[in-house]
Amino acid sequence: MSKNGTTGNKKKKTKLSTAATIAANIAKANATLNNNNNSNNNSNNTNIGNSINGIPSSLPPSVTLPVEELISFAPECLLFSQLLEFEEKLDASINKRLIDIQEASRRNSIKNIRTLRLSIYNTYSNQSAYYHLDNKSLNSVQERPSWSLRVEGKLLDESQDELVNKSIKSSSSSSSTANKRKFSSFFKKVFIQIGHRDTCEWDKSQTFTETDGFEIKRNGNQEVDIKILMYLDHVPQKYKVLGGLSQLLNIHTDTKPRIILALWHYIKSNTLLDAETKKITCDENLKNIFSLEELQFNQIPQLLREHLSPPDPLEFQYTLHLSGDAKDYEQAYDIQVEVDEPIFNPNPTMRKEISQLNDEINHHIQKVYQHKRKREFMEKLSSDPLGFLNDTTANLVKDFQVSKSTTSTGFEEERHASFYYQPMTEELVKNYLSKQTTPNPTPQQISMAPSTPQTP
């Protein structure tokens, strides 16, 4: 018995020491987070309770434990509540950092320049057997000659992004392709002209799914020239600078804030701003562009509208080939596109893992509640068995009465005989009996009274 008692004490001491260690670590982490938060309180007052960039918030506020009720027999529940508080502070600190980085990226337009390789080719079928057939013969054939035009693309030089993504993702194979952008996401409109009469148009605003390429299928056996116009989807919106303003600022296509900033640098470098009146005196170049002698700085955005236009589309010429190998006629082009930093991309793998952990925690918390109710049941039964059984039976009877009573009078009234001596009872019984149909008597069941003999 002494050995068992010693072993139990050792287990209890080990358990308490582990709990104390966890509590100490939580206290240290809380102190560190408090210091960091206090130093950054003035940096941003944005609401950080919501999830940022697809990172799910940890546990919902409803997932808590009744610490006051459990601490008497399960002191470890206090550690769980402390972990929840620590997790909230950790999420708040991370979200603050993400917001700061996002605001800095918006101001500085942090983008990665990547190379998008565009491939244009076509395939064909049922062409060789129709060289010597006229139009009437073609109409009589079931399998008509056809061709398909394919426009595809993929990003090159993905090694750098993959290294960054691997540092923030798990080692699963699916995570390496989770955040790859689709080809159609880089364009907002694609216009294809086939010959002189046939045209096709794809608009990003009218579609809900992204694709890895575009395919056009047509029936025919003639080689035609195809013109492809592709409009890049710039985020933020970019504009083409027209005329003399483009030569003055040495800008062809850029965002409106950058164009205004370049114009402001030109004004400052040439000392065209009057410090007293805050007006800009136009030199010969600005006079030729804006046709004004002087202007206010707040007039610049409105004046720029006449000198900005949507950027030019990417134009490609392709000739349809209906003989030979398709790879021999494939055309490839490299396009420079802007891609966001990998840190801002949502991480589906991490979100799924966090969601699974949250579900597991919720499952265990529900088990804790179940065991708590069982313990309360057993505790009441052990303290006052008779009274507890009487209370439980009374509650069950009430539930049974509510579930089985189908009339509006109540279950208790129907238990007394006086309920059935009411005037309506006789009427209800008569109605019930009148509805009962009696079977028709059969010929064998009909009894005839003997006839009386007639006297002559």
UniProtKB/Swiss-Prot annotation:
The lineage of its organism: Eukaryota, Amoebozoa, Evosea, Eumycetozoa, Dictyostelia. Keywords: Chromatin regulator, Nucleus, Transcription, Transcription regulation. Residues 234-310 form the SWIB/MDM2 domain. GO terms for biological process: chromatin organization; regulation of transcription by RNA polymerase II. Involved in transcriptional activation and repression of select genes by chromatin remodeling (alteration of DNA-nucleosome topology). Gene3D superfamilies: SWIB/MDM2 domain. This is SWI/SNF complex component SNF12 homolog. It is found in: Nucleus. SUPFAM superfamilies: SWIB/MDM2 domain. Belongs to the SMARCD family. Residues 435-456 are annotated as: Disordered. InterPro entries: SWIB_domain (IPR019835), SWIB_MDM2_dom_sf (IPR036885), SWIB_MDM2_domain (IPR003121).
